[in-house]
Amino acid sequence: MSSSGHPRFKPASQPPLQWSEFEKVDMRVGVVVEATDFLEARRPAYKLTIDFGPLGLKRSSAQITHHYRPADLVGRHVVAVVNFPPKQIGPFISEVLVLGAYNEAGEVILLHPDQPVTPGSKIG
């Protein structure tokens, strides 16, 4: 399937953001310290505990089971939005949104820095 045929690849349909709106999004690099199966989730997912350095440990639910195993995620750097309000997902509270790109099959591929950075480093 070509990238234009998948719904995740449609052109932006939202109005442009103002720079001041973008500046409100706090994206940081963290290191996964724990990853377990989220058995209670409706769709296959993992429960992640992520170290964001001075921001501390934060938890997230991530639907990334197609390309990652829990053991492979521990020690991995990820990028997440850290200033959304906590979200209840079944019995779990997700505190951050781990970011990824969708491939043509609609599966999430995690974003990560290509050079070493300190946990808690701000994305800008």
List each model region and its residues.
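Phosphate-backbone binding interfaces of nucleic-acid-interacting proteins
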Residues: 1-124
